[in-house]
Amino acid sequence: MRGDTGAIVGVCISHERASVDQLETAAADSERHAVESLLANPAVEEAIALQTCNRTEGYVVVSDHEDGLEALELFTRAVPDDVVVEMGHEESLRHLLRVAAGLESIVLGEDQILGQLRTAYETARGVGGIGPMLEDGVTKAIHVGERARTETKINEGVVSIASAAVRLLKQESSLTDGTALVVGAGEMGQLAAEALSEEVDRLLVANRTVPHAEHIAESVDIDASALALDGIEAAVSEASAVISATGSGDQVFDIGTFSDSGDVSIVDIAQPRDVPAGADRLPSVTVYDLDALESVTAETRNKRQRAAEAVERIVDEEFDRLLTQYKRKRADRVISTMYESAEQVKAAEINSALSAADFDDEQAEVVEAMADAIVSQILAAPTKSLRDAAEEDDWSTIHTALQLFDPDFGGPDQATPPEFTKGMSVEDIPDGMRDEIPNAMLDRLSDD
């Protein structure tokens, strides 16, 4: 039963352990491509990828943990083992909740990660990556992110990587001549433009799609102009500060871009990076990357620590609820399967009995009522055992029950136990269930 016994396996490569180069290496071409590649693996039932400027994460639902890690080598194979965090089912769920709440971000509590997770969810759902397991996990994470920001002050102050970049430029006195350039017109570019508009007199916005750049230029309350990417070299010569935040797969700048520039400071928060590695060796160019933002975000982190403690409590509370929800759903699915199997056997035996003798309607009702009572009594103890097993995380018992009570088991056309029971002995059945299973079924397993 696809999805009924699977569990989540996840990997995370983030700014906590990985360099900017390693983050760039780990990232797939796109979240969509990553999910499609993961789903191409026959062991993977569900999949989602989350790629931002400071993290690359992948999650799959599989029946075997090692199969999951093998599939997730899509992200991990080209980076050192010590920058990869491997996560099992519960670790993955808790981590997702923490990510959505902003507890794992460079800027503690920043808002953008919640939108990025929503986008990753919609992307994965669009290509068939979201099933019941990830549906519950990711939507719960989004709910936690919303609670964190409405019930605490986790996102007060510097609230984005873009605003942290502006603060860094201000600290380094790079905003003194009044002109700044933003490259990229996505959400991060919009935030950078808004933050810069409070510090400079003139803003240039460059983007591959000029109308998008025009939209940002029109949204700020200072002198602002939009331009295409082929006008970047001229724009750099006018600006003393640049924030680059495109989602381009190609580098936007080259060394020649800075040939006519004066002193310019660039914060490159794109993933992959927009600025070539050798640019910071030019005497007039200073390049800052995500690592440089740590000094700016440390102050914000300290201010938000009390709020973070409240968010941790929200995460703990919602995590416990999520686990209970998973356990209840999985136990209910197995119990439903068990009852379906019993109903098939009951219906077949009633039909056989009623056709073999001349029962009137009242007698037939008595036979059917007796059969219902027998099924209920037989399954009462296994039902309790399954619910107890779910509460105690005893998934081996639940998996055995799924095999034993497969809907095809005991069907009228089946004279022998189905294929899945080959190699299974009576001793493999949990004690609480074995005592309640009809001897005929046990004999068929023993004979096989």
Curated annotation (Swiss-Prot):
It comes from Haloarcula marismortui (strain ATCC 43049 / DSM 3752 / JCM 8966 / VKM B-1809). NCBIfam families: hemA. Possesses an unusual extended V-shaped dimeric structure with each monomer consisting of three distinct domains arranged along a curved 'spinal' alpha-helix. The N-terminal catalytic domain specifically recognizes the glutamate moiety of the substrate. The second domain is the NADPH-binding domain, and the third C-terminal domain is responsible for dimerization. Its EC number is 1.2.1.70. It is an enzyme of class 1 (oxidoreductase). Belongs to the glutamyl-tRNA reductase family. GO terms for molecular function: glutamyl-tRNA reductase activity; NADP binding. It catalyses: (S)-4-amino-5-oxopentanoate + tRNA(Glu) + NADP(+) = L-glutamyl-tRNA(Glu) + NADPH + H(+). It holds the Pfam family Shikimate_DH. This is Glutamyl-tRNA reductase. Coiled coil: none annotated. Pathway: Porphyrin-containing compound metabolism; protoporphyrin-IX biosynthesis; 5-aminolevulinate from L-glutamyl-tRNA(Glu): step 1/2. The active site is at 53 (nucleophile). Substrate binds at residues 52-55, 105, 110-112, 116. NADP(+) binds at residues 184-189. Keywords: NADP, Oxidoreductase, Porphyrin biosynthesis. Catalyzes the NADPH-dependent reduction of glutamyl-tRNA(Glu) to glutamate 1-semialdehyde (GSA). During catalysis, the active site Cys acts as a nucleophile attacking the alpha-carbonyl group of tRNA-bound glutamate with the formation of a thioester intermediate between enzyme and glutamate, and the concomitant release of tRNA(Glu). The thioester intermediate is finally reduced by direct hydride transfer from NADPH, to form the product GSA. The record marks 95 as: Important for activity. Homodimer. Residues 406-435 are annotated as: Disordered. InterPro entries: 4pyrrol_synth_GluRdtase, 4pyrrol_synth_GluRdtase_dimer, 4pyrrol_synth_GluRdtase_N, GluRdtase_CS, GluRdtase_dimer_dom_sf, GluRdtase_N_sf, NAD(P)-bd_dom_sf, Shikm_DH/Glu-tRNA_Rdtase. One of its GO terms (biological process) is protoporphyrinogen IX biosynthetic process from glutamate.
